[in-house]
Amino acid sequence: MEKKKNNNNGGDFGEEESSIDGDILESILSYLPLLDLDSACQVSKSWNRAVFYSLRRLKTMPWLFVYNQRNSPPYTMATMAMAYDPKSEAWIELNTASSPVEHVSVARSSHSTLLYALSPARFSFSTDAFHLTWQHVAPPRVWRIDPIVAVVGRSLIIAGGVCDFEEDRFAVELFDIESGDGAWERCESMPDFLYESASSTWLSVAVSSEKMYVTEKRSGVTCSFNPVTRSWTKLLDLCPGECSLYSRSIGFSVNRLIMAGIIGDEYNPTGIELWEVIDSDESHLKFESIGSMPETYLEKLRGINSDWPLTSIVLNAVGDMVYVHGAAENGGEIVAAEIEGGKLCKWRTLPNADATWKKSHAAERVIVACSNVGFSDLKLAFRNNLSFLSTSKY
C-alpha cells in the first residue's frame, strides 16, 4: 500500500488522517500535558480537531512559578523563570527575550496568583497566568512600605503597611480596575485589633470571588473585607480546638478557604495540618480536616538536618492543588499535594526542586506564584514569544 506524503509546508496540515478512532484519540489526548497537546495540534487536521474536543475532558492543574529579581536597583526581573507542571511532574524553563517589566522596587506575590510592585511613581500588578502582562496605575494616596494587596473581581485592594508619618496606620484604599478613572478610593480602615500586625509580614491573605480574607499568622485573628460595601467583618479566630498552632497560612482552592497550620514550635515543628474553613455563619467557623503533611515531607520542607527555625510557611492554593514551602529561603523543598474528594492525596516534593530552589544568585530574590494554566494561556504565551524548555523529572 502506498504511503501518503505529508506536505506540511508553511504551517499547513497534511492530508493523512489518524487511524485512531476519534473518541479514543480524544481520551488519550486529555491525559497529555499542555505542551504535548500543542505539538499534537501540528500532526494533522484530525488531530487538531481531537485536541480541541479533548479540552472538554482536560483537568486543568495549576502550575507553580519561581521568578528571580535583583535585590538592588535596577530591580530587574530575570528573563528566565521556572514553572512546575504537575501533570508532567517536571520543571519547565521559561525564557523571554527581555525582562517583562523594569521595576523601581521589589516585586512581591499575594494570594498565589497576584504579582505586584509598589513605588512612589506607580503601582504595577499582574494577574495573567504567566505574568507576562503588567498593568501600571497611579500610586496609592497613602505611602506604604509593607502592605497587604489583593485583587477581588474588578477591585484592587491595598491595606496596612503604612509609614509612621501617615495619620492612619490602618488605611485601606481601593482601585476599580475597570472604571478607567485612575483614582484610589479610601475605605473603612483595618480593624484596630490588628494594631501590632497590620502588614504583610505578619498577615496571610486569601481571596474568594467576593471577599478578601486576612488572618494574623501567629494568633489566628481573622477578618474579611467586602469590596462592594467597602467594609470589614470580624470572624472567629482560626484556631481548631484539637490543635495548638504557632503559625498558619491561608489560601483559596476553588470555593474553599484552606488553612495550613504548624504544630510544635519554631525549632521543633512536629506537624503541618490542613483544614477547610467553612464560614457560612460568621459567628461560627467549622474546621474540616483535609489532611496532614507526612513527616518525611515536613523534614524536606524544613531542610534535612537544617538548624533554621521554621517560623512560618507559605501556602499556594489554586484549583485542586496546594503547594507549601517555608517562608524563609533556607534551602527547604517545596511540598505539593492534590485535593480529591475534599481530601489531600498524592503528596510529593517537587523533582529537582533542590537545584531550582537554591540556584538563585545571592544578589537575587525569589518570588513564588501559582496559576491555573489552560491551553489558551499557553497559546497566548507563544504569541508573546515565551519559550519553553522541559527539564528531566529526576
UniProtKB/Swiss-Prot annotation:
Pfam families: F-box-like. Signal peptide: none annotated. InterPro entries: F-box-like_dom_sf, F-box/kelch-repeat_ARATH, F-box_dom, Kelch-typ_b-propeller. Residues 15-62 form the F-box domain. GO terms for cellular component: cytoplasm; cytosol; nucleus. Kelch repeats lie at residues 65-111, 155-204, 206-252, 321-369. It comes from the Eukaryota. Keywords: Kelch repeat, Repeat. One of its GO terms (biological process) is proteasome-mediated ubiquitin-dependent protein catabolic process. Coiled coil: none annotated. This is F-box/kelch-repeat protein At1g23390. The lineage of its organism: Eukaryota, Viridiplantae, Streptophyta, Embryophyta, Tracheophyta.
